Amino acid sequence: MLSEFENGAPVQQFVSRFRSYSSKFLFFPCLIMSLVFMQWLISIGPYSGYNTPPMYGDFEAQRHWMELTLHTPVSQWYFRDLQWWGLDYPPLTAYVSWFFGIIGHYFFNPEWFADVTSRGFESLELKLFMRSTVIASHLLILVPPLMFYSKWWSRRIPNFVDRNASLIMVLFQPALLLIDHGHFQYNCVMLGLVMYAIANLLKNQYVAATFFFCLALTFKQMALYFAPPIFFYLLGTCVKPKIRFSRFILLSVTVVFTFSLILFPWIYMDYKTLLPQILHRVFPFARGLWEDKVANFWCTLNTVFKIREVFTLHQLQVISLIFTLISILPSCVILFLYPRKRLLALGFASASWGFFLFSFQVHEKSVLLPLLPTSILLCHGNITTKPWIALANNLAVFSLWPLLKKDGLGLQYFTLVLMWNWIGDMVVFSKNVLFRFIQLSFYVGMIVILGIDLFIPPPSRYPDLWVILNVTLSFAGFFTIYLWTLGRLLHISSKLSTDLRNKKEA
């Protein structure tokens, strides 16, 4: 780490202005204001489905769920308007949509969420309201646990400047900001609940961690990416260093209680009819192995081997399940054998990358899940990991380029990506010659493909050629990041094993 911050990265120079005792209290207000300012700059641009009837896009889906939950009995939430952005997220998302719908309807403009007639409604005022709900959710739910995580690891990075420079880079990661505040979604809520779970694991508050993770699952089903690692970590704490059966029972009761609480209206009314419909909507296996062009194994393989023409849907489900289990097994076993806090982020990252690369029904935006635990590794203070974390972030936002380009967010994309890499001096390379070559190759590949996409139209015979190139390079990069997280996890766990063995011998 640099000791003379004035010669360091711009983010270090910024933080160093607050390192005096009299100025430290100003740092976090300035950080929050800077984050909100950036979110609003992104929000000025268009969103998913802007002015594109008849179905519009994710913005209309989120608005419609507010309309639907506002005017429809709870028992019909998962039955109504299935052809017009029917509700396909778990109940906590529905509750949040209802809450925001109540605020918009009664305190601002009822036309925004009028039953049926508001479909496709677009106005500057509605856009301002919807954008505000995402920003508020981001600040209230995601930012606090990230700050706690950074502070908890401050014992590894006692220096005020280095510690908070890392926090800034995590808070300003381009992929999440562009998807939530540009494209328009509420991923920050689910990711924030996951971070609250991780924060409570750091505090040994296992019941609270279980509760928050169950909330994440009931907000977005994609939080399942983290279910195996957190399960095996918690299971490990129940049997090591000694068996704690009472803890296992308490955690099990917490899971049952949380899901029962969230699902209570449907359980109370008619669980035999309503719960199966919720499961059917939340897990739409009939949609296929993936949607659109996504940088995972199956979509990449499909460019040379048409797997959907060879295997049935059921066979693909089984095959993807086997591949996913194989990819997440090592990290889950390590977290079970060594439930240590220093392994949490790496274990979550490795398992969620495995899920993203090999699981069934993956969206391109799902890359935000493995990107979160990968990014928070910056807070651990190991400078040798920075090149890989930076590469993961740049690959993630690069893989989202076709979607963001479609949304008309090209200006926001390039501005934010260039700014993030510049302020954090993120385009750095490992000292290892092989690693340096791999990292440099991916950066060159991204620049070349972006240049081609911007200035050369694809052949009429292959209109998706540039997208396929993007998917192929991104998959190769993500698989490399997966191998890196797994390799690092194995390395640290082997050192832990050696240390434990030496203690026993002593």
From Swiss-Prot:
Residues 46-132, 185-210, 269-317, 364-382, 430-436, 486-506 are lumenal. It is a multi-pass membrane protein. It is found in: Endoplasmic reticulum membrane. GO terms for cellular component: endoplasmic reticulum membrane; fungal-type vacuole membrane; Golgi apparatus; lumenal side of endoplasmic reticulum membrane. It comes from the Eukaryota. Its EC number is 2.4.1.267. The chain crosses the membrane at residues 25-45, 133-153, 164-184, 211-231, 248-268, 318-338, 343-363, 383-403, 409-429, 437-457, 465-485. Pathway: Protein modification; protein glycosylation. One of its GO terms (biological process) is dolichol-linked oligosaccharide biosynthetic process. One of its GO terms (molecular function) is dolichyl pyrophosphate Man9GlcNAc2 alpha-1,3-glucosyltransferase activity. It holds the Pfam family Alg6_Alg8. Its main location: endoplasmic reticulum. InterPro entries: Glyco_trans_ALG6/ALG8 (IPR004856). Keywords: Endoplasmic reticulum, Glycosyltransferase, Membrane, Transferase, Transmembrane, Transmembrane helix. Residues 1-24, 154-163, 232-247, 339-342, 404-408, 458-464 are cytoplasmic. It catalyses: an alpha-D-Man-(1->2)-alpha-D-Man-(1->2)-alpha-D-Man-(1->3)-[alpha-D-Man-(1->2)-alpha-D-Man-(1->3)-[alpha-D-Man-(1->2)-alpha-D-Man-(1->6)]-alpha-D-Man-(1->6)]-beta-D-Man-(1->4)-beta-D-GlcNAc-(1->4)-alpha-D-GlcNAc-diphospho-di-trans,poly-cis-dolichol + a di-trans,poly-cis-dolichyl beta-D-glucosyl phosphate = an alpha-D-Glc-(1->3)-alpha-D-Man-(1->2)-alpha-D-Man-(1->2)-alpha-D-Man-(1->3)-[alpha-D-Man-(1->2)-alpha-D-Man-(1->3)-[alpha-D-Man-(1->2)-alpha-D-Man-(1->6)]-alpha-D-Man-(1->6)]-beta-D-Man-(1->4)-beta-D-GlcNAc-(1->4)-alpha-D-GlcNAc-diphospho-di-trans,poly-cis-dolichol + a di-trans,poly-cis-dolichyl phosphate + H(+). Belongs to the ALG6/ALG8 glucosyltransferase family. Probable dolichyl pyrophosphate Man9GlcNAc2 alpha-1,3-glucosyltransferase that operates in the biosynthetic pathway of dolichol-linked oligosaccharides, the glycan precursors employed in protein asparagine (N)-glycosylation. The assembly of dolichol-linked oligosaccharides begins on the cytosolic side of the endoplasmic reticulum membrane and finishes in its lumen. The sequential addition of sugars to dolichol pyrophosphate produces dolichol-linked oligosaccharides containing fourteen sugars, including two GlcNAcs, nine mannoses and three glucoses. This is Probable dolichyl pyrophosphate Man9GlcNAc2 alpha-1,3-glucosyltransferase.
